[in-house]
Amino acid sequence: MTMDQKTDNAGKCPVAHTAPRGRSNRDWWPDQLDVQVLHRHSDLSDPMGKSFNYAEEFRKLDLDALKRDLHALMTDSQDWWPADFGHYGGLFIRMAWHSAGTYRITDGRGGAGQGQQRFAPLNSWPDNANLDKARRLLWPIKQKYGNRISWADLLILTGNVALESMGFKTFGFAGGRTDVWEPEELFWGPEGTWLGDERYSGERQLSEPLAAVQMGLIYVNPEGPNGNPDPVAAAHDIRETFARMAMNDEETVALIAGGHTFGKTHGAGDPSFIGADPEGGAIEDQGLGWKSTFGTGVGKDAITGGPEVTWSQTPTRWSNYFFENLFNFEWELSKSPAGAHQWKAKNAEASVPDAYDATRKHVPTMLTTDLSLRFDPVYEKISRRFLENPDQFADAFARAWFKLTHRDMGPKVRYLGPEVPAEDLIWQDVIPPVDHELVDDADVAGLKAKILASSLSVQELVSTAWDSASTFRGSDKRGGANGARIRLAPQKDWEVNQPAQLARVLSVLEGIQRDFNASQAGGKKISLADLIVLAGNAGVEKAARAAGQEIIVPFTPGRMDASEAQTDAASFAALEPRADGFRNYVNSSRLQFMKPEEALVDRAQLLTLTAPEMTVLVGGLRVLKAGQPEHGVFTSRPEALTNDFFVNLLDMGTQWSPVEGKEGVYEGRDRKTGAARWTGTRVDLIFGSHSQLRAFAEVYAQTDAREKFVKDFVAAWTKVMNADRFDLV
């Protein structure tokens, strides 16, 4: 049925017909800026209620009992979805891997932290075919343990137990992933079809922030790039994709080989026998998808993807067979019963067991992407080392698996449970524990006085604090003011942070810090991380006074300063903004598939802000000249925390037009005289153009809103300054 047909039926009785769906606003105006992404995962969609505290529930969990039940499940094969080789280990490893494997380092989104594999689109991605069965196998255990284990934690814990049940020693497990209750609307790519690859440009350049090679895949195409069975070309895709998942070459080899030590793939027949995915299935299927009419549709007849591959002679036990087979045999291209490209060992004896017939054996088989670990020269060197040193392989896989499954959990302070490893790992963005007495209210007042008596302006104080704190990403809980990594590479050199100004501000603040700490008895200190935030607060308070408003910005000390040794500079490079509308900054060369105003909403979502919070922050930061002050400073009183940005933006006496030769820049002129008044960007003008954002702007432009504007700005500012203070939760 076309959209027009649906509209024509709108006035008819819905009882005897399919219920009509009228055009949504997005249907009418598909290019309209979507700010609703800032209002998802609210209390209104959470059945647990505001008082529910998952950390408290998890602490009540009998983890040993839960793991015993999971161990028992591994070999409790069910007729409706039988276990390969009598053991569900391979299936559950794939489930956990694919839950975590959507993570991408560029924006920190994806990953296992919210249990999103339960929802569309992930639950229906082609690469997640039949993982709905894995989650259904887990339901009786989830039902038994209830609120004490989230789905997000259970998916990862089950992967760990699967490994342990097959003889592998894992590195550890941390709970603390809180479930969400609605799908995340993320940008997974520009494609409108499964397995499309419009995300590439030039010489196979993958657009940011994407990590997977095709729509609906977790990583790479196992048959090779776009199904081309070329192991060397596939290595290029593997390296790029895994790097965008924050994995280096050694971790990549360990993960592929370790995961493919267990289980098998499923390509028993032509994919045309497979039915709809879970989201597209019939109501009587109850959320189970990919129903197959090939043979029995399950077990030996299962079709999940295309290849039909078993890598190891002991697919339910940890071994080094993957590397032994990879190097001991030569490989010839073949096809699976489903018609997919795969490789079989030349002149090899049948030594690999059949998953369902104990009397049958098969020759070893591999995927194109497996052979990449031998035929790419860098991967080959690592693979041979693992072949010759199985203990190094086991350790590398254990560590890489832990990183894969915990990468998006943020700092270690968020980890829960008795299996949290004691070792600090650099990718955890380690921050030292507080080792000194913290400043009190009198100290704070004295420090603010010294800061305001220094040579630093309100603009410099506010900009530096915002630069430090606004790196926070609610997606993977990275960044933020804690650690004061703004003084370290690479952040100190980012264009958006105005390096020359930043160096000058930090030099002054470090002097104030030294003087204060040297004057204290008993070990009382203030960290630079705390002082940067406190200085920003002092600047905001001074700006409020200049606008006729007295207010104290809340401040809680306890941040610490990270060292260079605790900072992976290459990893932190991913936090550099492609755009930050709060500072009117755009790096157009990196801003793909997004307009600047869309990037603003994207940044606001990473900061966990609502649309009103985003609005008031932009208005306040503009008049304080934070960031890039060339455009959008709609005030004659800069560095005073007024509502002038909104008042002047909504003034009908101003007429806006694009500036010739400056894409995305507009000039506002007096509607009668033509005299120039202001210049602004798309990010500035969206608050007058977009009907919902204009409604928020009107609230703050009202004559009676001056006090509310300052209070709301301070509340949103404090939220950003404390966004990474998980120790306060």
Swiss-Prot record:
- Name the segments for region: Disordered: 1-26
Cross-referenced InterPro entries, in alphabetical order? Catalase_peroxidase, Haem_peroxidase, Haem_peroxidase_sf, Peroxidases_AS, Peroxidases_heam-ligand_BS
Q: Could you name the domain of life of the organism this protein comes from?
A: Bacteria
Q: Where is the active site?
A: H98 (proton acceptor)
Molecular-function GO terms, alphabetical: catalase activity; heme binding; metal ion binding
- GO CC terms of this entry: cytosol
- EC number(s) on file: 1.11.1.21
Q: Where is this cross-link: Tryptophyl-tyrosyl-methioninium (Tyr-Met) (with W-97)?
A: Y219-M245
Cross-link Tryptophyl-tyrosyl-methioninium (Trp-Tyr) (with M-245) placement: W97-Y219
Q: Mind telling me which residues the site (Transition state stabilizer) is annotated on?
A: R94
Which PROSITE patterns would you find in this protein's record?
PEROXIDASE_1 (PS00435), PEROXIDASE_2 (PS00436), PEROXIDASE_4 (PS50873)
| Xref: Gene3D superfamilies | 1.10.520.10, Peroxidase, domain 2
Catalysed reaction equations from the record: H2O2 + AH2 = A + 2 H2O; 2 H2O2 = O2 + 2 H2O
**PANTHER family annotated for this entry?**
CATALASE-PEROXIDASE, HYDROPEROXIDASE I, BIFUNCTIONAL CATALASE-PEROXIDASE
The similarity annotation says: Belongs to the peroxidase family. Peroxidase/catalase subfamily.
Self-association state and partner proteins as the record states:
Homodimer or homotetramer.
Q: What is this protein called?
A: Catalase-peroxidase
Q: Which organism is it from?
A: Sinorhizobium medicae (strain WSM419) (Ensifer medicae)
Record lineage:
Bacteria, Pseudomonadati, Pseudomonadota, Alphaproteobacteria, Hyphomicrobiales
